[in-house]
Swiss-Prot record:
The lineage of its organism: Archaea, Methanobacteriati, Methanobacteriota, Stenosarchaea group, Methanomicrobia. It comes from Methanosarcina acetivorans (strain ATCC 35395 / DSM 2834 / JCM 12185 / C2A). HAMAP family: BriX. It comes from the Archaea. This is Probable Brix domain-containing ribosomal biogenesis protein. Coiled coil: none annotated. InterPro entries: Brix, Brix_dom_Rbsml_bgen_prot.
Length: 157
């Protein structure tokens, strides 16, 4: 899975791109002048996430399939924990928790193991969990919230 930025990303956008790639065990590149076809080539037959900006801040995620077709997009504002700088991301695939349209879209895109919200507390201590709700997407590690996306809009194509 490849995660990339808009063409001229701000430092905040690059930071979010790197965090997402570490969380979902994907690969992060800075887009530069690459077009969509070049990005699809870099994705090596896998899906693609493009982090877009709104007023210089990360504000949109576009989720593309391996052919470059936009599947869905998510508009958001972001929040980071003070612990994020010292957190070590294990090289494990995260699990997905949550209900609703966004959680369903994430399940079909990422193919992560999905668990019920009640089962999250029973996961091993180093587990990373993507908790997707209709208003908020919480990225947790070792039981702590690392960063969140406050959902402002969701659109399927």
């Amino acid at each position: 899975m490849l995660i990339t930025t808009s063409r001229k990303p701000s430092a905040k956008t690059r930071t979010l791109c790197k965090l997402l790639s570490r969380f979902i065990t994907g690969r992060c590149i800075t887009r530069g002048k690459m077009g969509m076809q070049e990005l699809i080539g870099f994705a090596e037959g896998g899906p693609l996430i493009v982090v877009g900006e709104y007023h210089g801040n990360p504000g949109e995620l576009g989720f593309y399939d391996d052919a470059g077709k936009l599947l869905f997009s998510l508009r958001f504002s972001d929040w980071y924990s003070e612990d994020i700088g010292s957190y070590w991301f294990p090289d494990l695939e995260p699990v997905l928790a949550g209900q609703g349209e966004i959680a369903d879209a994430f399940e079909s895109f990422f193919h992560f193991k999905r668990v019920e919200s009640e089962e999250v507390d029973q996961l091993p201590p180093l587990s990373t969990v993507l908790v997707a709700g209709e208003k908020e997407i919480d990225f947790t590690g070792s039981g702590k919230s690392l960063f969140k996306l406050n959902v402002k809009g969701f659109k399927k194509y």
